[in-house]
Regions:
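FAD-binding core/adjacent interface of flavoenzyme oxidoreductases
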Residues: 34-122, 140, 145
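Beta1-alpha1 glycine-rich phosphate/pyrophosphate-binding loop at the start
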Residues: 1-34, 121, 128-166
Length: 166
């Protein structure tokens, strides 16, 4: 299990994934008559309190659905093709790695145009997560880059936050 409100901190190297991730089963250690099964639900028979799942039939007393979430690109194929979503720790680590790789490449590239492209970060979505990511990257730009990359001016990094609202 993970704590989604802090996933942006993982992406910006503010915290480690273990700070917001923990085994779901540990929440219920020592609980009697509690069983956790992760499966794909195929049918729900509420009158019989039975689920038909990818691992067979499961009876229940109380049923809690934790359906998760997916990134909505609102039909924007360009964003869908080029963006790095950030709904879970794995995606946040992918974003973190992409950022750090770009910083490393920017240090050694010979073209100023390429360097600027590597240091331009575009955040699509001005909701809570987008704003938090922009703020965390600003902190990274002002405090981490000068220490970890002293031979690369942090002023070269640009952060753009794009919102498609009305």
């Amino acid at each position: 299990h993970q704590f989604p409100p802090l996933i942006y901190q993982v992406a910006s190297a503010g915290i480690e994934p273990s700070s917001i991730s923990f085994p779901f089963r540990k929440l219920f250690h020592g609980r009697k008559d509690f069983y956790f099964r992760m499966a794909e639900v195929r049918s729900v028979f509420t009158d019989q309190k039975i689920l038909q799942t990818s691992i067979g039939k499961i009876s229940y007393d109380y049923l809690v659905f934790a359906a998760g979430t997916t990134t909505n690109f609102f039909g924007n194929k360009n964003v869908e093709e080029h963006a790095i979503p950030m709904k879970n720790v794995s995606e946040a680590m992918g974003l973190r790695n992409a950022l750090l790789e770009n910083f490393e490449r920017a240090l050694t590239c010979s073209s100023e145009t390429e360097r600027q492209e590597l240091l331009n970060v575009v955040i699509v979505g001005g909701g809570a997560t987008g704003v938090e990511v922009a703020g965390a990257l600003s902190e990274m730009k002002n405090h981490v880059l000068p220490k970890d990359y002293p031979d690369m001016p942090s002023s070269l990094m640009n952060i753009y936050l794009i919102e498609a609202g009305p």
